[in-house]
Amino acid sequence: MPKPTKGPRLGGSSSHQKAILANLATSLFEHGRITTTEPKARALRPYAEKLITHAKKGALHNRREVLKKLRDKDVVHTLFAEIGPFFADRDGGYTRIIKIEARKGDNAPMAVIELVREKTVTSEANRARRVAAAQAKAKKAAAMPTEESEAKPAEEGDVVGASEPDAKAPEEPPAEAPEN
């Protein structure tokens, strides 16, 4: 059940705060990035991310839930047609807040909040590392049978190793798992 915000609100009453957040979210989805004060950006982030999560699901019920919050049908269409599918494989973290210099006049702390449009460098690097490790493992597995077939004739003539009951095969170092 939704609980009212305790303490100071953005600009006064709770209804005014809802209107501010709806307008900020509309501008964010329309333009991709907006410049606002830091407290407004911090309040907008979870609000906008919940709306994007609704858009990822894409059902009619989710569209109606978003239309309760955002009144602009064009922005809701953009949210469901473009923004939601773009973030389909991302679990949260759809927005980024970047602090900028304080506003002249009243020295209010300012920030830019924007939709994260690029893939993360670390996820691409991890994917490349996993692919390289899988290829190396496949290459090593393909090379192992040829080495064993070349080594078998030498082992058949070697009776000393076979007659010892406690003889152990040389241990191979464990295959390294790719780092995440």
From Swiss-Prot:
Keyword DNA damage: no
Pfam family, one: Ribosomal_L17
Positions of region (Disordered): 134-180
GO process terms (BP): translation
GO molecular function: structural constituent of ribosome
Calcium as UniProt keyword: no
PANTHER family reported for this sequence: LARGE RIBOSOMAL SUBUNIT PROTEIN BL17M, RIBOSOMAL PROTEIN L17
Subunit note: Part of the 50S ribosomal subunit. Contacts protein L32.
UniProt name for this protein: Large ribosomal subunit protein bL17
Gene: rplQ
